[in-house]
Amino acid sequence: MKNKNILILGSTGFIGRSLTKKLLSKGHHITSPVRNPDKVKRNILSGDIGQINIIPFNVSNLYSIEADIKEADIIVNLLGILFEKPNRSFDTIHYHVPKVIADMANKHNKRFIHISSLGSTTETKSSYLYSKALGEQYIETNHNNYSIIKPSIVFGEEDNFLNQFGYMTKFLPFLPLYKKGNTKFQPIYLDDLTSFISEIIDSDDSNFLNKSIDAVGPNIYSFKEILEMIFEIVKKKKRFINIPDFFASLQGRLMGALPNPPFTYDQFLSLSHDSISPGADKFIEASLGRELSSMKLVASNYLKKFIDKV
């Protein structure tokens, strides 16, 4: 396998840290454009000296990395946000950024791997899902060497989803159910997802080229079933409270004003859309040559910390 020069946008995020370490372990060279260089210290420790190149980067000046894109073999875009701030909108991060990066990658004939989101659609009131769909559509229309990966919920030891609700069981007598807990998800384990992205990077298989690929795990759960699983792992009685849509939307608007909101109005809107792709897991299993990981089995290991000590 030929070692490649890979530029990763979003290398300090939950998925980015895992992917960077995996690619470094395979001997690839990584260029990591970051706003705060100190954030990538953990990744540096997993690579050899000179194997990772950290460069300053800000989305307000995307063309500052064009020379680095020209020198790379593959561009991976993992940039994404779950809530907006005055200086970073969904439209900017999910549409404008991938548009400009895709154009530069196309100009220099570089392969572009874009990580989006399962459930993205222009038929939605959710700005998050809408902006994700716009980014995908631009790449599909204007780039000639791309792969778009669309994960459902990604879980792992440092995730902000299962851990958040596990933490809530320690302090709340119940967990909230939005949309009656009926929204469906097909969660994928972080290591499975980054192994799959790594496989795409290493492979010249045409099955990955110029395609949008749903990245999901082996099991489909409703939101309520996920919370029930968390209660089982932390050994607590299952207690829920159904939040009517009116109060859920109000709660989302109020919480959305916080610096790091645990729930927003846009997230409430996104719960009107399932995040599943039945059968798509088989394609990933075939690509990896193994079965995908069970959420309950994996999560049991890292949610134990929320079990009350006797």
Predicted feature locations:
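Conserved beta-loop-beta element that borders a ligand/cofactor-binding pocket
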Residues: 137-167
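Substrate-binding strand-loop-helix patch
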Residues: 182-191, 213-232, 242-253, 291-294
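NAD(P)H-binding glycine-rich loop region in Rossmannoid oxidoreductase-like domains
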Residues: 38, 46-99, 104-106, 118-122
